């Protein structure tokens, strides 16, 4: 008897049962988050929600940001670029702010592969295969980031908030921040997926935005962030239905549909920043020679609490 023919239906039933169980848990424990994750993948739903928020939000004069650590900002132009290209590049942190964040990172305990059971005093100077613990691909400071007064100031920076509010069409709700290292450690596709090093898109709200800053110099050997221009809209219907499970699709298949010519690798010196609509296909590429340290700050239109803790990432 062919055992493969028996095992295949069993696997399908197991996956179906597991899906139903997780759906039930999500619907009963966090219904708002559960429904958002199911509905926000569809562009027509996101557009409808954005229209409602735009109608209910009082007009604000935020075309120019004042008293920002980022200097003078043309918020309208930044938001317009994100709407067409999925991302805006060109923000710049002052070097004293970069140094404050580096000092924080070098004196604070991080967590290997975002595992709270694997604390590590990471400095980014460790030699792969020598100083780093086994299988260390990333090291995130997770909740310890709340100890950084510099990060807290950036979260409330008038310029950053103005960019977020203009793009969102609503008052920006801070969802979370993260500082993390990515190390030049080769991995298989499963490990790359766990480290967000394959093309995927996020579903953290109906409309949300992320601001990134490199805290070390990043070139093509340091694992630059990459995105596929314009893919926050016009996704293949199959990819809308799949949602975050698009991370299981090979990058080659994603590029075959959306075009390799639309891939943008973001390189820059320490302090360089960019703003992205995370509904576009994006990834952190795998470093090949040097580690990368990056700060990200996220805002949305709804307050779900610590959504990343709920979702386990």
Describe the role of every protein-language-model region.
Residues 18-20, 33-84, 90-197:
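Non-heme Fe(II)-dependent double-stranded beta-helix
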Residues 148-153, 258-263, 284:
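Active-site rim elements
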Residues 192-209:
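Acidic, His- and aromatic-enriched active-site or binding-groove loops in soluble protein domains
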